[in-house]
């Protein structure tokens, strides 16, 4: 009985497939349309030291389904800003201060981290949504590297 069923299945012609693209015009250049600096994650390094990485969600072409999520340390964002300064000069906005040993960081670390997140959000929004900077090699390497 099973052999007979599989024979009948083999005799059925496949349904033709037609691919349709309902997305944006492929000739339009890709652009960053939004950026969200989200939660932080504390990572324990190989040497036992802990450090914080930030989740950065980059929305591409106004579609929440086309997004890239990065996890970056503050020092990586600092290096990114320095490369932008080399290419574009002092037009680049500042990052929030490093504050490695601030009183607020020691007494209320969650409030300090939220202030840091807001500062990083402001920086990333001003840099990545600027049409002049977002197409630069520096931004491409930061996002895709």
Swiss-Prot record:
Membrane topology listed for this record: Peripheral membrane protein
GO MF term set: phosphatidylinositol-3-phosphate binding; protein-macromolecule adaptor activity
InterPro entries registered for this protein in UniProt: PX_dom, PX_dom_sf, Ypt35_PX
Chief location of this protein within or outside the cell: membrane
Coiled-coil annotated residue ranges, if any: none
Alphabetically ordered keywords of this record: Endosome, Membrane, Vacuole
Cell compartment(s), UniProt: Endosome membrane; Vacuole membrane
One GO process term, biological-process aspect: protein localization to membrane
CDD domains recorded: PX_YPT35 (cd07280)
A GO CC term attached to the entry: vacuolar membrane
Domain PX: residue ranges: 32-145
Domain of life the protein comes from: Eukaryota
Its biological purpose: Recruits the lipid transfer protein VPS13 to endosomal and vacuolar membranes.
Family note: Belongs to the YPT35 family.
Comment block on domains: The PX domain binds phosphatidylinositol 3-phosphate (PtdIns(3)P) which is necessary for peripheral membrane localization.
UniProt protein name: Endosomal/vacuolar adapter protein YPT35
Native source species: Meyerozyma guilliermondii (strain ATCC 6260 / CBS 566 / DSM 6381 / JCM 1539 / NBRC 10279 / NRRL Y-324) (Yeast)
Phylogenetic classification of the source organism: Eukaryota, Fungi, Dikarya, Ascomycota, Saccharomycotina
Gene field: YPT35
């Amino acid at each position: 009985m099973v052999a007979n069923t599989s024979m009948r299945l083999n005799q059925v012609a496949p349904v033709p497939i037609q691919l349709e693209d309902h997305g944006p015009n492929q000739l339009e250049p890709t652009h960053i349309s939004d950026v969200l600096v989200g939660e932080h994650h504390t990572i324990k390094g190989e040497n036992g030291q802990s450090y914080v990485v930030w989740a950065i969600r980059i929305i591409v072409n106004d579609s929440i389904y086309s997004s890239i999520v990065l996890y970056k340390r503050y020092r990586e964002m600092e290096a990114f800003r320095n490369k932008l300064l080399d290419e574009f000069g002092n037009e680049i906005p500042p990052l929030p201060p490093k504050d490695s040993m601030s009183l607020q960081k020691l007494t209320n670390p969650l409030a300090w981290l939220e202030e840091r997140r807001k500062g990083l959000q402001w920086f990333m929004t001003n840099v990545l949504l600027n049409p002049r900077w977002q197409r630069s090699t520096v931004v491409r390497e930061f996002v895709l590297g």
